[in-house]
């Protein structure tokens, strides 16, 4: 994933619910990963988290740090081969890939993982 595309999935904890909604709308995947100024992963937020927050409080100006999941699932670069298993085990559709310093370097999506496996399987049949 190119850096420009990766940035559409990253947001800082100080940004508001409205800003998060705009980014989620733009990336069309229903999720954002919260990073600190060093781009280290510190949380995740989904469109469902935002919907539940709005039903509960109605506050669009709150910082996303108030409602983010502070323990998001992730894999390190060397563990990418296990990404599909992690997604299946935790019923998640997006999984950030971290380097050894905990910096987000890529995001894997469930549909893309299935496509890669399916295409790989087909090429073995030839």
What are these regions (language model features)?
Residues 1, 100-101, 105-126:
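Phosphate/pyrophosphate-recognition segments in soluble nucleotide-handling domains
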Residues 1-9, 60-72:
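Bateman (tandem CBS) regulatory domains
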Residues 2-6, 14, 38, 45-48, ...:
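N-terminal start-of-chain detector that recognizes signal peptides
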Residues 5, 28-29, 124:
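A structure-centric signal for secondary-structure junctions around beta-strands
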Residues 9-29, 35, 54, 73-92, ...:
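The conserved cystathionine-beta-synthase
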Residues 24-27, 32-49, 87, 95-112:
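A glycine-centered beta-loop-beta connector
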Residues 44, 58-61, 77:
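Non-catalytic, surface-exposed connector residues within folded enzymatic/regulatory domains
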Residues 49-64, 112-123:
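A short, polar/charged loop-to-alpha-helix boundary motif
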């Amino acid at each position: 994933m190119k850096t420009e595309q990766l940035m559409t999935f990253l947001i800082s904890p100080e940004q508001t619910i409205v800003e998060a909604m705009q980014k989620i709308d733009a990336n069309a995947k229903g999720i954002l990963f919260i990073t600190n100024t060093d781009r280290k992963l510190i949380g995740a937020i989904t469109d469902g988290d935002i919907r539940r927050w709005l039903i509960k409080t109605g506050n669009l100006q709150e910082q996303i740090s108030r409602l983010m999941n502070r323990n998001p699932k992730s894999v390190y670069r060397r563990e990418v081969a296990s990404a599909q298993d992690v997604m299946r085990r935790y019923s998640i559709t997006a999984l950030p890939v971290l380097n050894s310093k905990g910096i987000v370097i890529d995001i894997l999506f469930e549909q893309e993982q299935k496509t890669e496996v399916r295409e790989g399987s087909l090429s073995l049949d030839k």
